[in-house]
């Protein structure tokens, strides 16, 4: 026995290694079946193989996680149709020549006829009509519509893949994989549309073969074999019905298989691909109320006169019990969901053993807040986030929306890695007004803003008292502060993983440039430069310019800040365009005496250069910055300083004056149009100017 098993294993392995030869042999054998007479014993074997293949295919279709898992099905469908037609030709030849087509054909015919030719013929015709008009026609129509819709949806899906790739949501490898799957899906549904024509033609050919067998067989029996008409009718009808059934039953199974594959809608919401049987069971049992209503309906049918009461009551009990059982099963799930709403460390149901990472972006609201207002605010915040991603080439996480009880009913909170980054007030009755607009005003109803630094310049007023003070609604203020918060935390999300994704994109578009860059620059230094650029709101989209600049300077310069300055100079056109207004670039300068004070306060360590200014100088600088760079300025202005002061000055202003761009003279081209707004004088008051100068 072991020798037989080992021999079969060797044959199977050899067939798998030479699968192309096996396929070619199978096709040639089908052709020879149509022209060469076969013995009845071999016909029985081939009929059994045909039925087995049909059963195997329908079971395979039920366990497929998605249609693409059986992308060769159109070719298999063509081969099985050819095999079935060749088998019908062989059995027809045996019926007409020998009045014998093997044991399986005769057994099928005798079983269905059951002593009554008319009943057997009617049953056979019903099976044929069901296969041809219902299953085959329906599958053909679904294949046609599926192919059309798949082709129509291809451009949108391709654009979605390209958009995800540009936003660094997926890698280049993942994008190629998705494009390949999309192409494979379109080819599958297109091939299925054509393959269903074979199934339709096979059903029509089966009807014609049945008519030929019956009419030709009776004629041959009466005219050539001198049989009585009744005997010929009995013999050839049984054989014809048997032959038709051994063709129609596999055809019916394969038609159902085609319909199941075409109509398959994979459900991957949970991230696990399930077979169709499991999905049907889960979805049917997902609504317990439907089972209970069906049970009541069955009881109604049982009450009708003349109905089999016991049958309907039994079915009603089964449906009702199923519905109640599902309700009991759904209750623990609801409890688990309510428990899951509580922090895992507070539910007291289990000992936590898994690693729980910090959540990146969380928007927190009070449960009692207006859902419509929350939805509108979140939508606008998402628009600002997406604009930053597109405009600056950033990789920002998605938002998690959470309702918590530990904040006031009129508050909003934004956390980054579970650390509060922004806290603001939701209010309809008050509006925000800049504090400098209230100088000299006596408004006792004014409420100071939050202690967050960006909101030190704001106070809250009742809406009816705002008058002509240019008030801002709480929603608008939250959105503006959220945009600044997103910009300030963007460098945290340009780590090694995100930098590797950018480098992978560069490898696909500029392979030589990417190879040279990896040779001269480590991934860590590249990431550090990108973080510095993002911290100063410099767009990262011109990645080719950034890469070429780093390749040019990184071998003789080790300081990341200096490398960043080189990149900024290379991106001077992008930076100028970013801050340029209708009248050109509005700049504030620093007087030479003030530059001297700043240079005197420079201190340098092995890792950084920073300012150590006196209290008087720091207060004067902060005071003049508040005047020159209000948070809600009509046009964006920049602070223009010498190259050696730019980086440490930007670091000094990073916390309180994040919205103030600091540029160096080297980052302004000779053709740039510059309007000087005034000069910072750290020994005197701010000096506003009205003159225009071209740099």
From Swiss-Prot:
Involved in the secretion of harpin-pss; a proteinaceous elicitor of the hypersensitivity response in plants. It is found in: Cell inner membrane. Pfam families: FHIPEP (PF00771). This is Hypersensitivity response secretion protein HrpI. Keywords: Cell inner membrane, Cell membrane, Hypersensitive response elicitation, Membrane, Protein transport, Transmembrane, Transmembrane helix, Transport. It is a multi-pass membrane protein. It comes from the Bacteria. GO terms for biological process: protein secretion; symbiont-mediated perturbation of host programmed cell death. Signal peptide: none annotated. Belongs to the FHIPEP (flagella/HR/invasion proteins export pore) family. InterPro entries: FHIPEP_1, FHIPEP_3, FHIPEP_4, FHIPEP_CS, T3SS_FHIPEP, T3SS_HrcV. GO terms for cellular component: plasma membrane. The chain crosses the membrane at residues 21-38, 45-61, 68-92, 111-135, 203-223, 244-262, 311-327. It comes from Pseudomonas syringae pv. syringae.
């Amino acid at each position: 026995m072991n020798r037989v098993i080992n021999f079969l294993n060797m044959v199977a392995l050899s067939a798998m290694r030479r699968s192309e030869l096996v396929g070619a042999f199978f096709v040639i054998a089908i052709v020879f079946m149509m022209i060469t007479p076969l013995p009845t014993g071999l016909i029985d074997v081939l009929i059994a193989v045909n039925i087995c293949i049909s059963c195997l295919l329908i079971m395979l279709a039920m366990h497929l996680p998605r249609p693409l898992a059986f992308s060769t099905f159109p070719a298999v469908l063509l081969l099985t149709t050819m095999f079935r037609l060749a088998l019908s030709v062989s059995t027809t030849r045996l019926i007409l020549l020998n009045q014998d087509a093997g044991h399986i054909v005769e057994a099928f015919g005798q079983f269905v006829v059951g002593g009554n030719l008319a009943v057997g013929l009617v049953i056979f015709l019903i099976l044929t009509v069901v296969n041809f008009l219902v299953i085959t026609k329906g599958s053909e129509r679904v294949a046609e519509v599926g192919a059309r819709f798949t082709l129509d949806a291809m451009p949108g899906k391709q654009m979605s893949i390209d958009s995800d790739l540009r936003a660094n949501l997926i890698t280049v490898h993942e994008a190629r994989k998705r494009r390949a799957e999309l192409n494979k899906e379109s080819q599958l549904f297109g091939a299925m549309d054509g393959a269903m024509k074979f199934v339709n033609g096979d059903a029509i050919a089966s009807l014609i073969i049945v008519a030929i067998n019956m009419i030709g067989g009776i004629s041959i029996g009466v005219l050539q074999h001198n049989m009585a008409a009744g005997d010929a009718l009995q013999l050839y009808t049984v054989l014809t019905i048997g032959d038709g059934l051994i063709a129609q039953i596999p055809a019916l199974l394969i038609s159902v298989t085609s319909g199941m594959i075409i109509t398959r809608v994979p459900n991957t919401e949970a991230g696990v691909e399930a077979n169709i049987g499991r999905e049907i069971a889960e979805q049917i049992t997902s609504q317990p109320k439907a089972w209970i209503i069906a049970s009541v309906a069955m009881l109604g049918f049982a009450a009708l006169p003349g109905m089999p009461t016991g049958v309907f009551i039994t079915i009603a009990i089964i449906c009702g019990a199923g519905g109640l059982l599902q309700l009991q099963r759904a209750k623990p799930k609801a409890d688990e969901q309510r428990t899951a709403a509580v922090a895992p460390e507070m539910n007291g149901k289990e000992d936590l053993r898994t690693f729980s990472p910090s959540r990146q972006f969380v928007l927190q609201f009070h449960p009692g807040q207006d859902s419509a207002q929350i939805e509108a605010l979140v939508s606008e915040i998402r628009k600002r986030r997406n604009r930053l991603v597109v405009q600056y080439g950033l990789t920002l996480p998605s938002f998690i929306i959470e309702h918590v009880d530990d904040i006031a009913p009129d508050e909003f909170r934004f956390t980054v890695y579970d650390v509060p980054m922004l806290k603001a007030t939701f209010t309809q009755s008050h509006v925000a007004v800049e504090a400098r607009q209230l100088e000299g005003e006596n408004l006792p109803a004014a409420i100071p803003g939050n202690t967050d630094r960006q909101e030190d310049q704001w106070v809250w007023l009742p809406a009816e008292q705002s008058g002509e003070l240019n008030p801002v609604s709480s929603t608008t203020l939250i959105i503006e502060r959220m945009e600044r918060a997103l910009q300030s935390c963007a460098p945290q999300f340009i780590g090694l993983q995100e930098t590797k994704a950018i480098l992978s994109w560069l490898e696909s578009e500029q392979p030589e440039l990417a190879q040279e860059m990896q040779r001269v620059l480590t991934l860590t230094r590249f990431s550090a430069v990108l973080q510095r650029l993002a911290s100063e709101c410099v767009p990262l989209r011109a990645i080719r310019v950034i890469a070429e600049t780093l390749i040019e300077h990184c071998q003789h310069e080790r300081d990341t800040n200096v490398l960043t300055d080189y990149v900024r100079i290379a991106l001077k056109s992008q930076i100028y365009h970013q801050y340029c207004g209708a009248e050109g670039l509005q700049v504030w300068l620093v007087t030479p005496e003030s530059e001297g004070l700043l240079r005197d306060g420079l201190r340098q360590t092995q890792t950084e250069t920073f300012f150590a200014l006196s209290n008087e100088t720091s207060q004067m600088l902060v005071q003049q910055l508040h005047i020159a760079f209000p948070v809600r300025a009509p046009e964006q202005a920049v602070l223009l300083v010498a190259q050696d002061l730019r980086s440490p000055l930007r670091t000094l202003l990073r916390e309180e004056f994040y919205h103030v761009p600091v540029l160096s003279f080297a980052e302004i081209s000779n053709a740039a149009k510059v309007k000087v707004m005034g000069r910072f004088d750290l020994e005197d008051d701010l000096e506003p100017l009205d003159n225009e100068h071209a740099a």
